[in-house]
Structure formats: C-alpha cells, structure tokens
From Swiss-Prot:
Region (Disordered): 139-172
Comp. bias intervals (Basic and acidic residues): 139-168
Taxonomic lineage from the root: Eukaryota, Metazoa, Ecdysozoa, Nematoda, Chromadorea
Protein name: Uncharacterized protein B0563.1
Domain of life: Eukaryota
Length: 187
C-alpha cells in the first residue's frame, strides 16, 4: 500500500510584467496554479496518512503548512486571469503565496527525508546541488555588479579627466641619431 509520491511537481510561474506598473496573470499561470494546488493536496493527504501511522510532529507541521499554502493558492486562483496593479490585493496574495510556498517546499523536503530514509542521501544531494547553484548564481550576480560598478567608475573618471584636461604642447622631436661633426685635419 502506497500513501505518497516521493517528489511533487514544482511551481513555475510564467507571469510577466507586460507593463511596468501592471502584473499580468495569464490562463497558463492559472493552469500552473491549479496543478500546484492538486500536488499540494496530495502531499497534505500523504502527510495526514503518515501522521496517523507514526504520530510524529514533522508530519503535523507539514499538514499545517500545506493547509496554509492551499488556502493562499485558492485565493490567488479565485482572482483569475487579468492585469493587476502593484500593491493590489491580488499582488499581495501572490507575494504571500510565494512566501508560504517556500516554507511548504522546505517542509516537503524534510517529510521526504523522514518518509524514505533510504533515499535521504539522494534528496540531500539534490538539496545541496540546489543550494550550491543558488550560491553560484548569487556570486555571479555580485561579480557582475562589481564589474559594472568598476567599469562605470572608470568611465566617469575618464570623462572627468578628459573634461578638465588641458592639452599639452607637442614635445619637440629628439635627435635619435647623434651625429657629431667630424673634424678632419688635412696635412
């Protein structure tokens, strides 16, 4: 008898900023939200079953976090397709859902490790790879920002120096070949 799936589908949003001041939610986003909702409900049922079998706190916390995430996602889905202003109720709901989703993903990872200890090495390995990728991306972004800042500072310094530079007169050419007058004495 199997109560659980090891890995759930991940949430990927295709929401784009079509206009600088409006958030656009497409029908594809709603479809992704619904798929995520179904996966969350399944994971909550798995956690409920495991809680009944083992009575561990880890599963209880997973159930609570799942319930909170499902409520937030249902509210977002109810808002439907459309364009929303930043700071609107829908924008706030999406932001709160993303925060709860992050907490939910952490609890699901802990639940996966607890449910299948033999696969814990694989799950931990995936977790570490994800963490390393995030750190590498952040370091790359920081290096790029530093490089751009240095380039901008260098450009500004060059523009400043060229703005205030006084042209020096050209130097006189130097005699490279030194020719001394030859004095010949005729006898």
């Amino acid at each position: 008898m199997r109560f659980f799936n090891i890995f759930s589908s991940s949430f990927t949003s295709t929401a784009k900023w079509s206009c600088p001041n409006k958030l656009k939610i497409s029908s594809e986003d709603i479809r992704n939200f619904k798929d995520t909702l179904i996966a969350m409900k399944g994971r909550r049922m798995n956690a409920t079953a495991m809680r009944l079998l083992t009575n561990e706190t880890n599963y209880k916390v997973t159930i609570e976090v799942s319930t909170k995430a499902i409520r937030a996602l249902k509210k977002v889905i109810r808002r439907g397709v459309g364009q929303y202003q930043p700071g609107s109720k829908t924008d706030q709901l999406i932001t709160s859902f993303k925060e709860v989703k992050q907490e939910y993903d952490e609890m699901i990872l802990k639940m996966d490790i607890k449910m299948v200890p033999s696969k814990a090495d694989y799950v931990i390995e995936c977790w570490l790879k994800k963490d390393a990728a995030e750190k590498a991306a952040k370091e790359s972004k920081d290096r790029k920002a530093l490089k751009n800042a240095a380039r901008k500072a260098e450009k500004n310094a060059h523009e400043e120096s060229s703005y205030f530079r006084v042209d020096d007169p050209e130097p006189e050419p130097q005699n490279i070949y030194r020719i001394d007058p030859i004095i010949e004495i005729y006898v």
